[in-house]
Amino acid sequence: MEQNPQSQLKLLVTRGKEQGYLTYAEVNDHLPEDIVDSDQIEDIIQMINDMGIQVMEEAPDADDLLLAENTTSTDEDAEEAAAQVLSSVESEIGRTTDPVRMYMREMGTVELLTREGEIDIAKRIEDGINQVQCSVAEYPEAITYLLEQYDRVEAEEARLSDLITGFVDPNAEEEMAPTATHVGSELSQEDLDDDEDEDEEDGDDDAADDDNSIDPELAREKFAELRAQYVVTRDTIKAKGRSHAAAQEEILKLSEVFKQFRLVPKQFDYLVNSMRVMMDRVRTQERLIMKLCVEQCKMPKKNFITLFTGNETSETWFNAAIAMNKPWSEKLHDVAEEVQRCLQKLRQIEEETGLTIEQVKDINRRMSIGEAKARRAKKEMVEANLRLVISIAKKYTNRGLQFLDLIQEGNIGLMKAVDKFEYRRGYKFSTYATWWIRQAITRSIADQARTIRIPVHMIETINKLNRISRQMLQEMGREPTPEELAERMLMPEDKIRKVLKIAKEPISMETPIGDDEDSHLGDFIEDTTLELPLDSATTESLRAATHDVLAGLTAREAKVLRMRFGIDMNTDHTLEEVGKQFDVTRERIRQIEAKALRKLRHPSRSEVLRSFLDD
């Protein structure tokens, strides 16, 4: 039963009081597991020393021990001091709930790697990937898929660079790195997809260079060799069976030929996933059969495993189970039809793959072991280089992202670097990983730091513009104009103006204005949706003046003008509509309107309204 930190420390102090001394080994044994920080341990040792309990490398002799006991016995406040030690340590433990500190503490427990350690881990990653690659080579669908893709390249329906990145020379003195792949990667599927998108963007820029770097004649020769070996292997398996020594030899040769191809990660991952999907189909049917027999018919699981294993697609195991004349045997008749359907689906999988279910499982098992080996090695490489991420992330603080977010993005870049690292090139991993970490952090800042998101390519243009603008400021002693910036950057002036407009940072409406900080920026921004006080007062005065002027006309004339011009009404009216209202012709309404307007144009009346006309 584990002791809590308080009881462990009490035991340590009590033991020290009884002995008069403590050894470093005893302190280490009795310290709570939470306390791993060297500063905390030193503080505890110092407090124990202050209590009169000496902390030594080894147990002292009898004379020294007697002196130590005398010293300890004279300390009447030992118990109180022990309580102080406990309270200070417990408060220190309580303060370690900060995520950054906890992350740093856990990270500090992993030792840094030497160059030899990096090479050792990189080789283990390669071993795991090689094991996966050998497993894929035994999967007939993988070879046929690769040959089909090459036929598309020959028909100019696809690019060779989308299929392979090159070939491994089997005659080279040192074994070359296997296919670059995401096998065993610590990255999430979303990050892997982003990585592939970036690779595709880069690939579109220099696709011609990539295709030229792969010799088409060599590719034709290698694919012809793969096709020929595949045909020989397939015919041998068909004639003698997969378990025959000759067939195993041909499978090994096919695997060696397949390993010479350095596939694009996307293609290799597709082959691995297709095998995994096939295995999932097998498992689904097997689980269904087991559920029908064990859960529904109450067949003992031990009996089911004994009969089913090795006879997955045969009906003999099911017939044997029925023939056992057990209480559950009769119930198997009820599920016979469903079991037959599942067995038929398993036989269909065997026809599709050209492998038995047992062989599919064996290939998938070896592939999973290789993946696990690569994953463990990649995890070790990542954990040993977490300090590198923090050292780089520190330089990018106060740029819009929290420190933990910077670390997280840097870790994603680190994991990408682990996936792509090739130790044979001679440089240390940290040299290579620094670029990936820095790129991941800068991209995340560009993508997430701004309130209004700006595309990454535009961020790069803004940074370039700011850099050139600072240079020109130093040269000319003043801010450069957009025309001067356009000339220096070889860009159209209107684009420079757009970039300058985009580069402006949004500002808070709550930004205080003035020394008293009582007013905010939002108080000084005009609300265009509301009417200005001056316009409102002018409109009200015009309404009052219009009413006064109309009051000088007859009631009939005033109403005609009100209806014709929509004064104090929702809308204006036509002559026809006004005529119907007064039960007269439209011509009579026009005459009344003309007469009323002539009266209004008289200086005694028009002078009041003329002041409202705009200059």
Swiss-Prot record:
Its subcellular locations are: Cytoplasm
Q: Per the record, which residues fall in region Sigma-70 factor domain-3?
A: 460-536
Enumerate the UniProt keywords alphabetically: Cytoplasm, DNA-binding, Sigma factor, Transcription, Transcription regulation
Q: Which Gene3D superfamilies match?
A: RNA Polymerase Primary Sigma Factor, Sigma-70 factor, region 1.1, Winged helix-like DNA-binding domain superfamily/Winged helix DNA-binding domain
Q: Which GO terms describe its cellular component?
A: cytoplasm
> What assembly does the database describe for this protein?
Interacts transiently with the RNA polymerase catalytic core.
State what protein this is by name: RNA polymerase sigma factor RpoD
What organism is recorded for this protein? Salmonella typhimurium (strain LT2 / SGSC1412 / ATCC 700720)
Gene name, Swiss-Prot/TrEMBL: rpoD
